Amino acid sequence: MTLSPPARLARILALAVPALLLGGAYLSQYGFGLYPCEMCWWQRWPHFAAVGLALLAYVTPPARSWTALAALAIVTSGAIGLFHAGVEYGWWPGITSCALVAGNGSGNALEDIMNTPLVRCDQPAWTLFGISLAGYNFLVSSAAGLVIGRLLMKDRRA
């Protein structure tokens, strides 16, 4: 079955967006020394899944379903990015040990400090216009996932 132009564009975006975001993440990591924290890794996993799902859309029917699942994975990464950005901006506490929490319960402040990972989730490694990488992941991933979903719905109505 041949896909309509909107569905083809959705499939292209479902592959290109997470691949480019992962490429940017690895470029910033290995090219510029911005090493990922635990929550940064959480944001990458849905993008890996989205790339795999989008590739399936090219080789295995039903392409629309695989593309929709890829869009869902992309939006999931965006949601994790929103949570991570909120931790970085102090809107809410982090749920992992990579955010520095006053008094981790050991009763030994030095031990708490020594057990805190070197790359902390509650401190943005880099910002542009006051937005962290997690914030940009939220913006790009959420917008891309919604655009892909819209293209797929447009295709269904045609």
Annotated model-derived regions:
Residues 1-46:
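Transmembrane alpha-helical insertion/packing segments
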